Amino acid sequence: MRLNCFRIFVHIQKPTQIFKPFYRSLSSEASDKYHFVNGHKMSKAPTDMAPWPAFIEERIKLWDKLKAEYDAEIAAKESEPIQITLPDGKIHEGKTWRTTPFEIAERISKGLAEAAVIAKVNGAVWDLDRPFEGNAKLELLKFDDDEAKQVFWHSSAHVLGEAMERYCGGHLCYGPPIQEGFYYDMWHENRTICPDDFPKIDQIVKAAVKDKQKFERLEMTKEDLLEMFKYNEFKVRIITEKIHTPKTTVYRCGPLIDLCRGPHVRHTGKVKAMAITKNSSSYWEGKADAESLQRLYGISFPDSKQLKEWQKLQEEAAKRDHRKLGKEHDLFFFHQLSPGSAFWYPKGAHIYNKLVDFIRKQYRRRGFTEVITPNMYNKKLWETSGHWQHYSEDMFKIEVEKEEFGLKPMNCPGHCLMFGHMPHTYNELPFRFADFGVLHRNEMSGALTGLTRVRRFQQDDAHIFCRQDQISEEIKQCLDFLEYAYEKVFGFTFKLNLSTRPEGFLGNIETWDKAEADLTNALNASGRKWVLNPGDGAFYGPKIDITIQDALKRNFQCATIQLDFQLPNQFDLSYFDEKGEKQRPVMIHRAVLGSVERMTAILTESYGGKWPFWLSPRQCKIITVHESVRDYANDVKKQIFEAGFEIEYEENCGDTMNKQVRKAQLAQFNFILVIGAKEKENGTVNVRTRDNAVRGEVALDKLISKFRRFADEYVADTEKSEEWA
């Protein structure tokens, strides 16, 4: 019978053909307050469908049967004594297949058990109610831990998915956690979700949270999975195309059962505060020629206070949106005749160039050599690098004299050509090539978002070619560069993640192990906390991912440090060792800013348009008290401009002095220089800040000297009183 069901599905072409047959009344009895499904009691919400889709009951029936078999199998397992070691070295006794992380947490304190979101067992996240299977090292993670947040938001996505099914009976697709929150994709034959539906879905969310539905884990065979999800073509596709193991896991909370690796929070009651934030359309697996889906986004927290704080930050973020500030401050704009490519006004270009200049100065101090490479290459280069096979859909292609060329989406293959063009010896390494070349990526028009997702951009791209024994020191220097730029100059905090060998890796295990050990040693030597992401590395080498947090507590991934063993092989790169024998160099991909466009967007929003002096396109403005001092004002302007600073002066402004000062402050000029007869006589200017702090008379030569220090040392808050003492 199961085979017949499966054969029916593989021949079905459209989801519409599988939707209606399962829309029948549930046979389960119900009351005014509760749903009863196969003996399970669940709170009703006023906005629930009546009746629920029949697939919910059929799914639960199969679950109950298989779960009973699974529980009996676990109960029959022989339990053996084990030791559970905590991070502080304390050891707790337990038993295999019986003792759970939650029980250990309760032994320590009830408060810890209640606050814990998820467990980490032998380095892998683990359900709090899932029994240990052997001796274990145990960590208990709270919501402030990044991995715990991802689990919490993943569980919240399941709660949202349950509400979506109960509200309109759609077929769920993918529902992952994202950098901040989560989403769920749903297909529906004839229903469109809009913001007016959010409060109604939220009522069902609240009912699910009130029930404290347990998150339960079950391993199922592929055959049983096809039977359970036969009503949903999208799940059938995942099962048939993505699952290559005899068994996989599903999780249940209340009426929802879904394909999922887990782990999850203990029960839905942990999600005390949730908000649906927006909706959008999407395509199945991101393919434009596939079915159109509906996507709901959400955010959640363990308490309502955190949700309110987050909502306040979102209100502030809306005010600081870089697209809004870019327009208000005359920084950049976009035009339909060149989508995804920014037009930079002079003030925006000033910021852009200052960021590039900052990196250039660091390159000189840190041993990087800047190179210039072509924008366009014959497709043979991209075939050698592998990009033509795996990335060509995202490239802009051009035919030149009957041969196909591609605009470069990254610099690394060109740098490989440069390294391979001349012979090298071991004592010449490392080579550190840096490149600000223009890159192009053929992003879909619907994905373009201001400066954060563009088609034309520049990166502070660098590639280091080094020996195996130089990896650790090079990584250490890269981390030092990041720390200086992010923390000391931009004022960000950042986190480090080490992503190691994935399943489909290229190369030999010994080389990978050595590289991962080098990265681990460099991270440990940095003295910073870092997180291991097993199996999340690139196929060509392990990497360090860097996530920054801005003034609005938002996280962004900009920088990266990646080891690459494959491109040197593909381009047959070599150097001569001390014995005169050819050896293969290691390649390190490295960026600090990442895309200059994207970093400009992040900084615009983080600073809220109040640029630090060294980056500011509006460093100072002259305001004169009387027309008799205009000649002196123009002389001041000339000296400050020739010293290399941005200064403005309107001779014939008809506004009062107070109004001019206020306008300059709102325009975020760092300093307002007021000039009257006294200042002209003394050769000074009267300095005010954009925050209306009066710093008094300052001699012009002394002011220029201060400006130089502010710019050269990247002083963050030049308006502070101690800077003017």
From Swiss-Prot:
The UniProt similarity line reads:
Belongs to the class-II aminoacyl-tRNA synthetase family.
- Which PROSITE patterns has this protein been placed in? AA_TRNA_LIGASE_II, TGS
Q: What GO molecular function terms would the record report?
A: ATP binding; threonine-tRNA ligase activity
What keywords are assigned to this protein? Aminoacyl-tRNA synthetase, ATP-binding, Cytoplasm, Ligase, Nucleotide-binding, Protein biosynthesis
Question: Any idea where this protein resides?
Answer: Cytoplasm
Q: Name one GO cellular component term.
A: mitochondrion
The protein's annotated catalytic reaction(s) are: tRNA(Thr) + L-threonine + ATP = L-threonyl-tRNA(Thr) + AMP + diphosphate + H(+)
Top-level EC class as recorded in UniProt: ligase
- Statement: the UniProt record of this protein carries the keyword Glycoprotein: no
Q: What is this protein called?
A: Threonine--tRNA ligase, cytoplasmic
From the UniProt record, report the name of the gene that encodes this protein. tars-1
Q: Name one Pfam family in it.
A: tRNA-synt_2b
Q: Which organism is it from?
A: Caenorhabditis elegans
Offer one example of a GO biological process linked to this entry.
Answer: threonyl-tRNA aminoacylation
Secretion signal, residue range per the UniProt entry: none
Where does the record place the TGS domain? 80-142
Q: What is its main location?
A: cytoplasm
User: Which EC numbers does the record give?
Assistant: 6.1.1.3
Could you confirm whether the keyword Protein biosynthesis appears in this record? yes
